[in-house]
Amino acid sequence: MGANNGKQYGSEGKGSSSISSDVSSSTDHTPTKAQKNVATSEDSDLSMRTLSTPSPALICPPNLPGFQNGRGSSTSSSSITGETVAMVHSPPPTRLTHPLIRLASRPQKEQASIDRLPDHSMVQIFSFLPTNQLCRCARVCRRWYNLAWDPRLWRTIRLTGETINVDRALKVLTRRLCQDTPNVCLMLETVTVSGCRRLTDRGLYTIAQCCPELRRLEVSGCYNISNEAVFDVVSLCPNLEHLDVSGCSKVTCISLTREASIKLSPLHGKQISIRYLDMTDCFVLEDEGLHTIAAHCTQLTHLYLRRCVRLTDEGLRYLVIYCASIKELSVSDCRFVSDFGLREIAKLESRLRYLSIAHCGRVTDVGIRYVAKYCSKLRYLNARGCEGITDHGVEYLAKNCTKLKSLDIGKCPLVSDTGLECLALNCFNLKRLSLKSCESITGQGLQIVAANCFDLQTLNVQDCEVSVEALRFVKRHCKRCVIEHTNPAFF
């Protein structure tokens, strides 16, 4: 299916010989005049180009008034209505004036000092500019226009906005960036289009075809993309390491395309180089899909499966078999994960540093004991809402994971001051502790924690029956600690 889609999209892309045939453009070629009615991005991240309004590549609604040119006339985009389109500026034209007339009209101006800088210095200066400033620089003169399109300034493309026609924007941008290196954007390493709901498989296929050096792709919340498009990207971008498909409900698996598997390309060797994978809210993902992911993505170190509600302990067994290098794992709100699943996770041993099992209602002290025994270098544990955890589970954890820095055991009603005391006497490096809605916690337990964990920075005791005196005691001993509470008498 991926191959068929590829042929369809590819044939369409070759049918156009110029950028102007794909999008309607309306530009102001007068370097000294500022364009009006162009929405500009205020993104302060200088390393990422927020292309919601990039000139060189403007993304703006066509129903805005036409851009005013130097003579006061306007040209509007009339071929496309009711959608956001990508617009690409042409270089500012060179004014042709007879030299005698120019000399007679006014004396020739001296060259500006900034124009004496070499191109590489100008590009370095441009690299520190936000997108809206780079847009203005592109309209100053022909030289600045060309420099603004230097591929080194476009290592990252970031598109934002729910209504933007992101498929067309990606097509226009990649085509322009491919002018110096036909058909490929060798410098482009990061594409972020999270929240662009109009992104479809067509847009991802454009990325797959044109960005062989892609290392990071974020398509969070783009619920129209499917497995086939993701397969195309991971098959044609062998260097991809970071993939965020959270909220993409149609994505149920990650694998190579059939063609890539048959060819056994040396770029892959049947393996995908992804190390970071976020599949939060991919609620259609099942154990078999996770099995396929684990078998192909053996280099995974960070995996987030929050609210993948169909996963069970069996899926975690597959994961541990193939992905032995996982450092961070989240299975929060996976209601079928139980102590048997934690027994499998414990096989990751000392490599595991981060674990989130929040609201996994089937987890008890038994599962916590497995993790505490084998994952001695655990630094972060989120067990909020695991109502089966008691003081015994906290004791196992405290005595074996002594370098624990962050612990969330909120909404664990069976945890009391006894568990807190054991925690305080063993985990001196604790920096973040959440006890929200722990009904059995009192001020005495908090005082023991404060007296031993001097580096505590965040303490959540909302909906806990603790006195003002206990909170003041914590504040005196942990001066940098931010206390989240619901006691109106403490401020």
UniProtKB/Swiss-Prot annotation:
Belongs to the FBXL7 family. Residues 1-79 are annotated as: Disordered. This is F-box/LRR-repeat protein 7. The keyword Transcription does not apply. Keywords: Cell cycle, Cell division, Cytoplasm, Cytoskeleton, Leucine-rich repeat, Mitosis, Repeat, Ubl conjugation pathway. Substrate recognition component of a SCF (SKP1-CUL1-F-box protein) E3 ubiquitin-protein ligase complex. During mitosis, it mediates the ubiquitination and subsequent proteasomal degradation of AURKA, causing mitotic arrest. It also regulates mitochondrial function by mediating the ubiquitination and proteasomal degradation of the apoptosis inhibitor BIRC5. Its main location: cytoplasm. PANTHER family: F-BOX_LRR-REPEAT PROTEIN 7, PARTNER OF PAIRED, ISOFORM B-RELATED. GO terms for biological process: cell division; G2/M transition of mitotic cell cycle; mitotic cell cycle; protein polyubiquitination; protein ubiquitination; SCF-dependent proteasomal ubiquitin-dependent protein catabolic process; ubiquitin-dependent protein catabolic process. It comes from Homo sapiens. LRR repeats lie at residues 170-195, 196-221, 222-247, 253-281, 282-307, 308-333, 334-359, 360-385, 386-411, 412-437, 438-463.
